[in-house]
Regions:
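A short beta-loop-alpha structural element at the N-terminal edge
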Residues: 1-15
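Conserved GNAT acetyl-CoA-binding A-motif
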Residues: 98-109
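Residue-level recognition of the GNAT/N-acetyltransferase active site
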Residues: 78, 111
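A conserved beta-turn-beta hairpin within the catalytic core of GNAT-like acetyltransferases
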Residues: 61-72, 82, 129-130
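Conserved active-site alpha-helix within GNAT-family acetyltransferase domains
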Residues: 88, 112-132, 136
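Conserved acetyl-CoA-binding loop-helix of GNAT-fold acetyltransferases
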Residues: 77, 83-96, 119-123
Length: 138
C-alpha cells in the first residue's frame, strides 16, 4: 500500500531511497534540509515499502491584494508506479494541506505536450489558462 507522508524535518531519512524519475535531478541534501525548514514550503511523498515513488511540492503564495494561493511547484511519480492514482492522491492531499493553512486557490503550470499531466488537471476541474513563460538568469 502506498503511504502519503507530509515532509517535516523529522522525516528526512525518506530521501535516502528514491525511485527513478520522481525528481528531475538527483537529491541534494543541503537543498532538502533548507526546503523542509522554510515556512510555506510543503512536500508530500508517496512511499511504497520504504521507497519514495512520488512527490508533490508546493509553496504558499501570499499577496497583499489577493487571496492566499497554493502554488503546485512539482508533481512526479516513478514510471513503475504511474497510472495507479498516486499523483491524484498526492495533489488531493496537498490541496487539503493548503486549505488547512488558509489557501483559497491553487495554480500550477505544465508543458502543453504533457498529456498525462494535462489529463490529470482537467480531471480535477482545472481551468486551463494561457500565459507566456520566461526563464531569467539571476
Amino acid at each position: 500500500m502506498i503511504e502519503l507522508v507530509r515532509i517535516t524535518p523529522t522525516a528526512m531519512s525518506l530521501f535516502d531511497r528514491i525511485a527513478d524519475e520522481v525528481f528531475d535531478e538527483p537529491i541534494r541534501p543541503d537543498c532538502v534540509s533548507a526546503y523542509v525548514v522554510e515556512p510555506g514550503h510543503l512536500m508530500i511523498l508517496a512511499v511504497d515499502a520504504g521507497l519514495v515513488v512520488g512527490q508533490c511540492a508546493a509553496v504558499i503564495h501570499r499577496h497583499p491584494d489577493k487571496v492566499t494561493e497554493l502554488y503546485i511547484d512539482e508533481l512526479g511519480t516513478a514510471a513503475t508506479h504511474r497510472r495507479q492514482g498516486i499523483a491524484r492522491r498526492m495533489i488531493d492531499a496537498m490541496f487539503e494541506w493548503g486549505r488547512e493553512l488558509g489557501c483559497k486557490e491553487s495554480w500550477l503550470g505544465t508543458e502543453l505536450d504533457n498529456v498525462a499531466a494535462n489529463a490529470l488537471y482537467r480531471a480535477i476541474d482545472g481551468r486551463r489558462d494561457t500565459m507566456a513563460y520566461y526563464e531569467l538568469e539571476l
